[in-house]
Design a protein with these regions (language model features):
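Short, well-ordered beta-strand elements
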Residues: 31-42, 62-67, 90-91, 197
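Extracytoplasmic "Venus flytrap"/periplasmic binding protein-like
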Residues: 55-130, 166-168, 265-267, 274-275, ...
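Hinge/lid segment of periplasmic solute-binding proteins
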Residues: 96-154, 208, 298-300, 384, ...
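Short, solvent-exposed loop/beta-turn-alpha elements that line the ligand-binding surface or hinge
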Residues: 112-130, 173, 201-202, 219-239, ...
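C-terminal lobe and pocket-closing loops
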Residues: 116, 282-293, 306-416
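Extracytoplasmic/periplasmic solute-binding protein
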Residues: 137-150, 155, 178-230, 242, ...
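Conserved C-terminal helix/tail region of periplasmic/extracytoplasmic solute-binding proteins
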Residues: 165, 389-452
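Glycine-centered hinge/linker elements that transmit conformational signals in sensory
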Residues: 182-186, 226-258, 302
Protein backbone atom coordinates (compact mmCIF):
# COMPACT_ATOMS: atom_id res chain seq x y z
CA UNK A 1 0.00 0.00 0.00
CA UNK A 2 1.38 3.42 -0.90
CA UNK A 3 1.51 6.21 1.65
CA UNK A 4 2.14 9.86 0.95
CA UNK A 5 3.54 12.82 2.90
CA UNK A 6 2.74 16.28 1.62
CA UNK A 7 4.76 19.31 2.69
CA UNK A 8 2.60 22.41 2.23
CA UNK A 9 4.01 25.94 2.29
CA UNK A 10 1.12 28.36 1.82
CA UNK A 11 -0.47 26.66 -1.22
CA UNK A 12 2.39 24.52 -2.51
CA UNK A 13 2.05 20.73 -2.10
CA UNK A 14 4.88 18.27 -2.53
CA UNK A 15 4.05 14.57 -2.56
CA UNK A 16 6.74 12.23 -1.28
CA UNK A 17 6.53 8.43 -1.31
CA UNK A 18 7.10 6.87 2.09
CA UNK A 19 6.77 3.52 3.86
CA UNK A 20 5.75 2.48 7.39
CA UNK A 21 6.97 2.17 10.98
CA UNK A 22 4.99 0.21 13.58
CA UNK A 23 3.68 1.66 16.84
CA UNK A 24 3.76 -0.47 20.00
CA UNK A 25 1.46 -3.42 19.62
CA UNK A 26 2.09 -3.79 15.88
CA UNK A 27 0.27 -2.42 12.84
CA UNK A 28 -2.38 -3.76 10.55
CA UNK A 29 -3.59 -2.78 7.13
CA UNK A 30 -6.21 -0.12 7.75
CA UNK A 31 -7.94 2.68 5.97
CA UNK A 32 -5.54 5.58 5.43
CA UNK A 33 -5.72 8.37 8.00
CA UNK A 34 -4.75 11.91 7.08
CA UNK A 35 -2.70 13.88 9.59
CA UNK A 36 -2.32 17.66 9.32
CA UNK A 37 0.72 19.15 11.04
CA UNK A 38 1.02 22.92 11.62
CA UNK A 39 4.48 24.53 11.90
CA UNK A 40 5.57 28.19 12.10
CA UNK A 41 7.61 29.56 9.22
CA UNK A 42 10.80 29.98 11.23
CA UNK A 43 14.07 28.55 9.87
CA UNK A 44 14.28 25.47 12.09
CA UNK A 45 10.67 24.49 11.43
CA UNK A 46 11.18 24.88 7.69
CA UNK A 47 14.31 22.72 7.99
CA UNK A 48 12.25 20.11 9.84
CA UNK A 49 9.60 20.09 7.13
CA UNK A 50 12.21 19.69 4.41
CA UNK A 51 13.97 16.89 6.28
CA UNK A 52 10.70 15.11 7.01
CA UNK A 53 9.99 14.92 3.29
CA UNK A 54 13.07 12.74 2.75
CA UNK A 55 13.88 11.20 6.14
CA UNK A 56 10.65 10.47 8.02
CA UNK A 57 8.78 7.19 7.59
CA UNK A 58 5.20 7.38 8.90
CA UNK A 59 3.34 4.42 10.36
CA UNK A 60 1.49 2.21 7.85
CA UNK A 61 -1.63 3.77 6.44
CA UNK A 62 -0.76 7.32 7.48
CA UNK A 63 -0.70 10.30 5.12
CA UNK A 64 0.90 13.42 6.64
CA UNK A 65 0.47 17.00 5.43
CA UNK A 66 2.90 19.57 6.86
CA UNK A 67 1.73 23.18 6.65
CA UNK A 68 4.28 25.94 7.29
CA UNK A 69 2.39 29.09 8.27
CA UNK A 70 3.51 32.65 9.16
CA UNK A 71 3.89 32.80 12.94
CA UNK A 72 1.24 35.40 13.74
CA UNK A 73 -1.26 33.60 11.48
CA UNK A 74 -0.34 30.27 13.07
CA UNK A 75 -1.02 31.58 16.57
CA UNK A 76 -4.42 32.91 15.58
CA UNK A 77 -5.45 29.82 13.62
CA UNK A 78 -4.35 27.33 16.26
CA UNK A 79 -5.90 29.31 19.12
CA UNK A 80 -9.20 29.35 17.23
CA UNK A 81 -8.86 25.67 16.39
CA UNK A 82 -8.06 24.66 19.97
CA UNK A 83 -10.70 26.84 21.61
CA UNK A 84 -13.52 25.74 19.30
CA UNK A 85 -12.71 22.03 19.29
CA UNK A 86 -11.82 21.98 15.60
CA UNK A 87 -9.95 19.14 13.92
CA UNK A 88 -8.36 20.83 10.91
CA UNK A 89 -4.93 20.34 12.48
CA UNK A 90 -3.95 17.20 14.35
CA UNK A 91 -0.60 18.47 15.66
CA UNK A 92 -0.23 21.95 17.14
CA UNK A 93 3.04 23.89 17.42
CA UNK A 94 3.16 26.45 20.23
CA UNK A 95 5.15 27.56 23.27
CA UNK A 96 4.95 27.26 27.05
CA UNK A 97 2.46 30.13 27.29
CA UNK A 98 -0.09 28.18 25.27
CA UNK A 99 0.89 24.81 26.76
CA UNK A 100 0.00 25.78 30.32
CA UNK A 101 -3.24 27.55 29.48
CA UNK A 102 -4.44 25.10 26.83
CA UNK A 103 -3.75 22.09 29.06
CA UNK A 104 -5.85 23.70 31.80
CA UNK A 105 -8.69 24.31 29.35
CA UNK A 106 -8.59 20.73 28.01
CA UNK A 107 -7.37 21.87 24.60
CA UNK A 108 -4.38 19.47 24.51
CA UNK A 109 -4.11 15.70 24.79
CA UNK A 110 -2.22 14.30 27.78
CA UNK A 111 0.88 12.57 26.39
CA UNK A 112 1.44 10.24 29.34
CA UNK A 113 -0.95 7.51 28.10
CA UNK A 114 0.80 7.58 24.72
CA UNK A 115 4.20 7.18 26.36
CA UNK A 116 2.82 4.32 28.45
CA UNK A 117 1.61 2.60 25.28
CA UNK A 118 5.07 2.61 23.69
CA UNK A 119 7.23 -0.49 23.75
CA UNK A 120 9.94 -0.52 26.42
CA UNK A 121 12.61 -0.29 23.72
CA UNK A 122 10.96 2.73 22.10
CA UNK A 123 10.64 4.50 25.46
CA UNK A 124 14.29 3.82 26.28
CA UNK A 125 15.45 5.00 22.86
CA UNK A 126 13.54 8.27 23.20
CA UNK A 127 15.20 8.95 26.59
CA UNK A 128 12.92 11.55 28.19
CA UNK A 129 15.53 12.17 30.89
CA UNK A 130 17.76 13.74 28.23
CA UNK A 131 15.26 16.56 27.61
CA UNK A 132 16.52 19.77 29.25
CA UNK A 133 14.43 20.00 32.46
CA UNK A 134 13.47 23.68 32.15
CA UNK A 135 12.15 23.08 28.65
CA UNK A 136 10.29 19.85 29.41
CA UNK A 137 8.86 21.15 32.69
CA UNK A 138 7.45 24.27 31.02
CA UNK A 139 5.16 21.98 29.02
CA UNK A 140 3.71 20.04 31.96
CA UNK A 141 0.56 20.43 34.04
CA UNK A 142 0.37 18.58 37.35
CA UNK A 143 3.45 16.60 36.36
CA UNK A 144 2.03 15.31 33.07
CA UNK A 145 3.52 16.27 29.70
CA UNK A 146 1.14 17.91 27.25
CA UNK A 147 3.80 18.73 24.66
CA UNK A 148 7.36 17.86 23.65
CA UNK A 149 10.01 20.55 23.05
CA UNK A 150 11.24 20.77 19.47
CA UNK A 151 13.78 23.47 20.28
CA UNK A 152 14.37 25.94 23.04
CA UNK A 153 15.79 29.41 23.22
CA UNK A 154 16.79 32.29 25.37
CA UNK A 155 18.02 35.55 23.86
CA UNK A 156 21.32 37.25 23.26
CA UNK A 157 22.99 39.89 21.12
CA UNK A 158 24.33 39.00 17.69
CA UNK A 159 26.60 41.48 15.96
CA UNK A 160 28.52 41.89 12.73
CA UNK A 161 32.23 41.84 13.59
CA UNK A 162 33.20 43.38 10.26
CA UNK A 163 31.03 46.46 10.78
CA UNK A 164 32.33 46.82 14.32
CA UNK A 165 35.93 46.64 13.14
CA UNK A 166 35.29 49.08 10.30
CA UNK A 167 33.92 51.59 12.80
CA UNK A 168 36.54 50.95 15.49
CA UNK A 169 33.93 49.68 17.95
CA UNK A 170 33.97 47.00 20.64
CA UNK A 171 30.93 45.13 21.92
CA UNK A 172 30.91 44.69 25.72
CA UNK A 173 30.14 41.13 26.80
CA UNK A 174 27.32 42.43 29.02
CA UNK A 175 26.15 45.72 27.49
CA UNK A 176 23.36 47.99 28.66
CA UNK A 177 20.53 49.05 26.38
CA UNK A 178 21.98 52.55 26.33
CA UNK A 179 25.35 51.20 25.20
CA UNK A 180 23.66 49.20 22.45
CA UNK A 181 21.84 52.30 21.27
CA UNK A 182 25.06 54.32 21.05
CA UNK A 183 26.84 51.51 19.20
CA UNK A 184 23.92 51.19 16.78
CA UNK A 185 23.93 54.92 16.06
CA UNK A 186 27.67 54.83 15.39
CA UNK A 187 27.21 52.05 12.82
CA UNK A 188 24.01 53.36 11.22
CA UNK A 189 24.75 54.63 7.70
CA UNK A 190 21.54 54.72 5.66
CA UNK A 191 23.24 56.50 2.76
CA UNK A 192 25.27 53.33 2.23
CA UNK A 193 22.48 50.91 3.11
CA UNK A 194 23.83 50.04 6.57
CA UNK A 195 21.44 49.59 9.50
CA UNK A 196 22.79 50.10 13.00
CA UNK A 197 20.47 47.67 14.79
CA UNK A 198 17.55 45.54 13.72
CA UNK A 199 14.76 44.14 15.88
CA UNK A 200 11.28 42.76 15.37
CA UNK A 201 8.86 45.59 14.66
CA UNK A 202 5.75 43.75 13.48
CA UNK A 203 2.98 43.85 16.10
CA UNK A 204 2.04 40.67 17.95
CA UNK A 205 2.56 39.48 21.52
CA UNK A 206 4.99 36.85 20.23
CA UNK A 207 6.48 39.08 17.55
CA UNK A 208 7.57 42.60 18.63
CA UNK A 209 6.38 41.68 22.12
CA UNK A 210 9.14 39.08 22.40
CA UNK A 211 12.02 41.60 22.56
CA UNK A 212 9.91 44.42 24.01
CA UNK A 213 8.68 42.75 27.22
CA UNK A 214 12.25 41.77 28.25
CA UNK A 215 13.26 45.37 27.52
CA UNK A 216 10.57 46.62 29.89
CA UNK A 217 11.81 44.16 32.52
CA UNK A 218 15.39 45.33 32.03
CA UNK A 219 14.43 48.94 32.72
CA UNK A 220 12.83 47.82 35.97
CA UNK A 221 9.30 47.95 34.66
CA UNK A 222 6.53 45.49 35.38
CA UNK A 223 2.99 45.14 34.08
CA UNK A 224 1.16 44.49 37.36
CA UNK A 225 2.11 44.95 41.00
CA UNK A 226 1.46 42.23 43.57
CA UNK A 227 -2.15 43.41 43.95
CA UNK A 228 -2.76 43.20 40.19
CA UNK A 229 -2.81 46.95 39.72
CA UNK A 230 -1.57 47.81 36.23
CA UNK A 231 1.87 49.45 36.31
CA UNK A 232 2.33 50.57 32.71
CA UNK A 233 2.29 54.31 33.42
CA UNK A 234 5.62 54.42 35.25
CA UNK A 235 9.00 56.03 34.52
CA UNK A 236 10.53 52.58 34.00
CA UNK A 237 7.96 51.58 31.39
CA UNK A 238 8.21 54.94 29.65
CA UNK A 239 11.99 54.59 29.42
CA UNK A 240 11.62 51.18 27.75
CA UNK A 241 8.99 52.38 25.28
CA UNK A 242 11.18 55.35 24.36
CA UNK A 243 14.32 53.24 23.96
CA UNK A 244 12.55 50.76 21.68
CA UNK A 245 11.40 53.63 19.46
CA UNK A 246 14.75 55.44 19.51
CA UNK A 247 16.66 52.35 18.39
CA UNK A 248 14.35 51.54 15.50
CA UNK A 249 13.71 55.11 14.35
CA UNK A 250 17.24 56.48 14.74
CA UNK A 251 19.31 53.37 14.00
CA UNK A 252 16.94 50.71 12.68
CA UNK A 253 15.63 49.25 9.45
CA UNK A 254 13.33 50.94 6.96
CA UNK A 255 9.69 49.86 7.05
CA UNK A 256 10.08 49.16 10.74
CA UNK A 257 6.75 47.58 11.59
CA UNK A 258 6.80 45.05 8.74
CA UNK A 259 9.81 43.27 10.25
CA UNK A 260 9.35 39.84 11.77
CA UNK A 261 12.40 37.79 12.73
CA UNK A 262 12.55 36.48 9.14
CA UNK A 263 13.19 39.94 7.70
CA UNK A 264 15.66 40.75 10.48
CA UNK A 265 17.54 37.50 9.86
CA UNK A 266 17.74 38.23 6.13
CA UNK A 267 19.06 41.73 6.84
CA UNK A 268 21.76 40.39 9.15
CA UNK A 269 22.67 37.62 6.69
CA UNK A 270 23.17 40.25 4.00
CA UNK A 271 25.89 41.92 6.07
CA UNK A 272 23.99 45.22 6.13
CA UNK A 273 23.08 45.32 9.84
CA UNK A 274 25.37 45.82 12.81
CA UNK A 275 23.42 44.48 15.82
CA UNK A 276 20.47 42.17 16.35
CA UNK A 277 18.83 41.30 19.70
CA UNK A 278 16.65 38.22 19.45
CA UNK A 279 16.34 34.54 20.26
CA UNK A 280 19.42 32.35 20.58
CA UNK A 281 17.83 29.99 18.05
CA UNK A 282 18.31 32.64 15.37
CA UNK A 283 22.10 32.29 15.44
CA UNK A 284 22.27 29.15 13.22
CA UNK A 285 20.94 30.87 10.07
CA UNK A 286 23.52 33.62 10.54
CA UNK A 287 26.28 30.99 10.48
CA UNK A 288 24.82 29.05 7.54
CA UNK A 289 26.26 28.82 4.05
CA UNK A 290 23.62 31.30 2.83
CA UNK A 291 24.88 34.01 5.20
CA UNK A 292 27.46 36.55 4.07
CA UNK A 293 28.59 36.99 7.66
CA UNK A 294 29.05 33.32 8.54
CA UNK A 295 32.11 33.06 10.78
CA UNK A 296 32.04 36.81 11.38
CA UNK A 297 29.21 36.97 13.93
CA UNK A 298 29.93 38.00 17.49
CA UNK A 299 27.75 37.07 20.46
CA UNK A 300 27.15 38.89 23.75
CA UNK A 301 24.89 38.44 26.76
CA UNK A 302 21.43 40.03 26.62
CA UNK A 303 21.35 43.76 27.39
CA UNK A 304 20.52 45.07 30.83
CA UNK A 305 19.76 48.27 32.70
CA UNK A 306 18.41 47.78 36.23
CA UNK A 307 17.80 44.13 35.36
CA UNK A 308 18.76 41.79 32.53
CA UNK A 309 16.54 41.24 29.48
CA UNK A 310 15.59 37.62 30.14
CA UNK A 311 13.87 35.31 27.68
CA UNK A 312 12.82 31.66 27.88
CA UNK A 313 10.80 30.01 25.17
CA UNK A 314 10.47 26.80 23.29
CA UNK A 315 8.61 25.69 20.24
CA UNK A 316 6.81 22.52 21.18
CA UNK A 317 4.51 19.94 19.66
CA UNK A 318 1.15 18.95 21.14
CA UNK A 319 -1.79 16.85 20.03
CA UNK A 320 -5.34 17.97 19.32
CA UNK A 321 -7.48 16.14 21.92
CA UNK A 322 -10.50 15.94 19.60
CA UNK A 323 -9.02 13.45 17.11
CA UNK A 324 -9.21 9.65 17.12
CA UNK A 325 -6.84 7.41 19.05
CA UNK A 326 -5.22 6.17 15.84
CA UNK A 327 -4.69 9.75 14.70
CA UNK A 328 -3.15 10.61 18.08
CA UNK A 329 -0.74 7.69 17.79
CA UNK A 330 0.23 8.77 14.26
CA UNK A 331 0.89 12.34 15.41
CA UNK A 332 2.83 11.07 18.42
CA UNK A 333 5.06 8.98 16.16
CA UNK A 334 5.99 12.11 14.19
CA UNK A 335 6.58 14.08 17.39
CA UNK A 336 8.89 11.39 18.78
CA UNK A 337 10.92 11.36 15.58
CA UNK A 338 11.19 15.16 15.31
CA UNK A 339 12.30 15.56 18.96
CA UNK A 340 14.62 12.54 19.13
CA UNK A 341 18.37 12.34 19.65
CA UNK A 342 18.57 10.55 16.31
CA UNK A 343 16.89 13.43 14.50
CA UNK A 344 19.28 15.93 16.07
CA UNK A 345 22.31 13.80 15.18
CA UNK A 346 21.05 13.46 11.61
CA UNK A 347 20.70 17.22 11.21
CA UNK A 348 24.36 17.62 12.16
CA UNK A 349 25.38 14.96 9.64
CA UNK A 350 23.50 16.77 6.89
CA UNK A 351 24.56 20.28 7.92
CA UNK A 352 27.63 20.39 10.22
CA UNK A 353 27.19 24.15 10.71
CA UNK A 354 24.32 23.40 13.09
CA UNK A 355 21.97 25.69 11.16
CA UNK A 356 19.31 22.98 10.96
CA UNK A 357 19.87 21.50 14.42
CA UNK A 358 17.27 22.21 17.14
CA UNK A 359 19.05 23.85 20.10
CA UNK A 360 18.33 23.77 23.84
CA UNK A 361 15.92 20.84 23.82
CA UNK A 362 18.27 17.99 24.80
CA UNK A 363 21.41 17.89 26.93
CA UNK A 364 23.03 15.39 24.57
CA UNK A 365 23.00 17.94 21.74
CA UNK A 366 25.85 19.78 23.45
CA UNK A 367 27.89 16.58 23.65
CA UNK A 368 27.97 16.24 19.88
CA UNK A 369 31.54 17.45 19.14
CA UNK A 370 30.62 19.29 15.95
CA UNK A 371 27.75 21.10 17.66
CA UNK A 372 29.74 21.96 20.78
CA UNK A 373 32.24 23.66 18.47
CA UNK A 374 29.77 26.05 16.82
CA UNK A 375 30.41 29.64 17.94
CA UNK A 376 27.05 30.20 19.66
CA UNK A 377 26.78 26.89 21.57
CA UNK A 378 28.61 27.84 24.77
CA UNK A 379 27.09 31.28 25.20
CA UNK A 380 23.62 29.80 24.62
CA UNK A 381 24.23 27.42 27.52
CA UNK A 382 25.65 30.22 29.66
CA UNK A 383 22.61 32.44 29.07
CA UNK A 384 20.21 29.59 29.81
CA UNK A 385 22.02 28.78 33.06
CA UNK A 386 21.69 32.39 34.27
CA UNK A 387 17.92 32.63 33.72
CA UNK A 388 15.74 33.38 36.71
CA UNK A 389 12.24 32.44 35.57
CA UNK A 390 10.61 33.44 38.86
CA UNK A 391 12.09 36.96 38.92
CA UNK A 392 11.60 38.59 35.52
CA UNK A 393 12.24 42.14 36.75
CA UNK A 394 13.47 44.15 39.74
CA UNK A 395 10.30 44.19 41.85
CA UNK A 396 8.13 41.14 42.58
CA UNK A 397 5.25 40.34 40.24
CA UNK A 398 2.17 38.09 40.63
CA UNK A 399 2.66 36.43 37.24
CA UNK A 400 5.20 34.22 35.50
CA UNK A 401 6.84 34.77 32.15
CA UNK A 402 9.97 36.49 30.89
CA UNK A 403 8.87 37.73 27.46
CA UNK A 404 5.17 37.23 28.09
CA UNK A 405 2.72 37.23 31.00
CA UNK A 406 1.38 33.76 31.69
CA UNK A 407 -2.32 34.63 31.88
CA UNK A 408 -4.85 33.62 29.20
CA UNK A 409 -5.71 37.24 28.40
CA UNK A 410 -2.15 38.15 27.41
CA UNK A 411 -2.52 36.86 23.85
CA UNK A 412 -5.09 39.61 23.29
CA UNK A 413 -3.84 42.41 25.51
CA UNK A 414 -0.19 41.79 24.61
CA UNK A 415 -1.00 41.98 20.92
CA UNK A 416 -3.01 45.18 21.44
CA UNK A 417 -0.13 46.67 23.42
CA UNK A 418 2.29 45.96 20.56
CA UNK A 419 -0.10 47.57 18.09
CA UNK A 420 -0.02 50.76 20.13
CA UNK A 421 3.75 50.35 20.40
CA UNK A 422 3.94 50.21 16.60
CA UNK A 423 1.68 53.27 16.32
CA UNK A 424 4.00 55.13 18.69
CA UNK A 425 7.11 54.06 16.77
CA UNK A 426 5.79 55.35 13.45
CA UNK A 427 4.45 58.55 15.02
CA UNK A 428 0.72 57.87 14.69
CA UNK A 429 0.18 58.40 18.42
CA UNK A 430 2.19 59.95 21.23
CA UNK A 431 3.91 58.08 24.02
CA UNK A 432 1.36 59.50 26.47
CA UNK A 433 -1.50 58.08 24.42
CA UNK A 434 0.14 54.67 24.00
CA UNK A 435 0.91 54.42 27.71
CA UNK A 436 -2.56 55.61 28.77
CA UNK A 437 -4.35 53.14 26.50
CA UNK A 438 -2.19 50.24 27.62
CA UNK A 439 -2.54 51.16 31.29
CA UNK A 440 -6.33 51.27 30.97
CA UNK A 441 -6.44 47.98 29.06
CA UNK A 442 -4.28 46.12 31.57
CA UNK A 443 -6.20 47.58 34.52
CA UNK A 444 -9.53 46.59 32.98
CA UNK A 445 -8.21 43.10 32.27
CA UNK A 446 -7.19 42.62 35.90
CA UNK A 447 -10.73 43.45 37.03
CA UNK A 448 -12.63 41.56 34.33
CA UNK A 449 -10.35 38.54 34.66
CA UNK A 450 -10.98 38.36 38.40
CA UNK A 451 -7.35 38.92 39.35
CA UNK A 452 -8.38 41.68 41.75
Amino acid sequence: MKKFMRFVVVVTCIAVLVSGVVFAGGAREQETVFINVALPNNPLSVALANLAATEYTPPPGVDIDISVIPENDLRQRLTTEASTGGTTFHMFTFGPYEALNWARFGWLADLEPLFANLSADRRAAYDRADLIPAMADSLKLDGNAYALPFYGESAFIMYNKDLFEQNGLTMPQRPTWNQLYELARAIHDPANGIVGMTMRGAPGWGMSGAPFVPMVNAFGGRFFDMNWNATVDTPQQRAAWQMYRDILVNAGQDDIISYTYNEAIALMQSGRAGIYFDATSIAPPLESAESRIAGRVGYAFPPREQHVSQWLWNWAFGINPNITQREKEAVFDFMLWATSKEFIARTMEIDPTGASTPPASRSSTYRIPAYAAVPYAQITLDVLEELDFDNPTVDPVPYQGLQYIAIPEFADIGTQMTQWLADFVVGSITLDTAIRRTQELFDRTAVEGGYR
